[in-house]
Amino acid sequence: MLERVLLLTLILSFVITVILSPIFIPFLRRLKFGQSIREEGPKSHQKKSGTPTMGGLMILLSILVSSLFVSFQLSIFSMDVLLLLLVTIGFGVLGFIDDFIKVVMKRNLGLTSKQKLIGQLVVAVLFYLGLRNMGLSTEVTIPATSLSIDFGWFYLPLVIVMLVGASNAVNLTDGLDGLVAGTGAIAFGAFAIIAWATNYFEVAIFSAAVVGAVLGFLVFNSHPAKVFMGDTGSLALGGAIAAIAIMAKQEILLIIIGGVFVIETLSVIIQVISFKTRGKRIFKMSPLHHHYELSGWSEWRVVVTFWTVGLLFAMLAIYLEVWIT
């Protein structure tokens, strides 16, 4: 029964996004909400300048409608769904403000790092308070074992690090057509399967809604992209994947399922440390996907390779949590 519900949720979310996009994209174009491309980025990206951005709004609306509709239809609407929506929409609003400043107010840097961090902290603390109100355990289980560690009050810093880290990691990864949408669909799909197998049904349904939304978006975001999700989408998806991991008690597994995002972030950190300490860059450009672009790979080849790596990470996570445990 639940398998059908998950599939129907995914399909509903997908259809909503596919229907909305042909209406929403021309609207964004009329408003001149076009993406500006950094001069220091790969030269091949300059032709993307002016492509409509803030497409993450379509993803958010699709997730909101499909998850609420299915939850109410099955009479399983709960604090779980509410908290997941709080994080997703909260980070989405933060991303929208950032996009608005860059696109409409023509301030290329958008929100300052401090302003963005404050917004992320506010959402993270509200999410944590909701978790405490639900009585969610502060224990963190080690995958493929029965061992767990009780973080106690240190669970709050963990929640903050996960939400802030994941949202920024997904945001960094969003640099090629279809890259985040594809890897995101795989990652959220893995969480849907794991949440279903471990009886976190509301989390599974929400995850399925996200999968459908990003797959629908991928139809218009794959190369050559007709629309970009912007920070509106990438920050929302990053916050959502961390919140799902926390709600499903798969905190450590997030590192594996989000392996592509972790690698992309590490490439930036390594590049910065190397340049500041040695005066040399390890990669031709960071994040890592740009390094491969400048090495002669086509954009599509880089994206498909990263999707494949993401799929392998997802399969490993499912194996560890579903088959071994």
Swiss-Prot record:
Membrane topology summary: Multi-pass membrane protein
Name of the top EC class for this enzyme: transferase
Pfam families in alphabetical order: Glycos_transf_4, MraY_sig1
Pathway: Cell wall biogenesis; peptidoglycan biosynthesis
InterPro entries in alphabetical order: Glycosyl_transferase_4, PNAcMuramoyl-5peptid_Trfase, PNAcMuramoyl-5peptid_Trfase_CS
GO MF annotations in UniProt: metal ion binding; phospho-N-acetylmuramoyl-pentapeptide-transferase activity; UDP-N-acetylmuramoyl-L-alanyl-D-glutamyl-meso-2,6-diaminopimelyl-D-alanyl-D-alanine:undecaprenyl-phosphate transferase activity
GO biological process: cell division; cell wall organization; peptidoglycan biosynthetic process; regulation of cell shape
Catalytic activity: UDP-N-acetyl-alpha-D-muramoyl-L-alanyl-gamma-D-glutamyl-meso-2,6-diaminopimeloyl-D-alanyl-D-alanine + di-trans,octa-cis-undecaprenyl phosphate = di-trans,octa-cis-undecaprenyl diphospho-N-acetyl-alpha-D-muramoyl-L-alanyl-D-glutamyl-meso-2,6-diaminopimeloyl-D-alanyl-D-alanine + UMP
HAMAP family associated with the record: MraY
Protein family per UniProt: Belongs to the glycosyltransferase 4 family. MraY subfamily.
Stored PANTHER family: PHOSPHO-N-ACETYLMURAMOYL-PENTAPEPTIDE-TRANSFERASE, PHOSPHO-N-ACETYLMURAMOYL-PENTAPEPTIDE-TRANSFERASE HOMOLOG
NCBIfam families noted in UniProt: mraY
Protein function: Catalyzes the initial step of the lipid cycle reactions in the biosynthesis of the cell wall peptidoglycan: transfers peptidoglycan precursor phospho-MurNAc-pentapeptide from UDP-MurNAc-pentapeptide onto the lipid carrier undecaprenyl phosphate, yielding undecaprenyl-pyrophosphoryl-MurNAc-pentapeptide, known as lipid I.
Name of this protein: Phospho-N-acetylmuramoyl-pentapeptide-transferase
Organism: Halalkalibacterium halodurans (strain ATCC BAA-125 / DSM 18197 / FERM 7344 / JCM 9153 / C-125) (Bacillus halodurans)
Phylogenetic placement of the source organism: Bacteria, Bacillati, Bacillota, Bacilli, Bacillales
Gene name, Swiss-Prot/TrEMBL: mraY
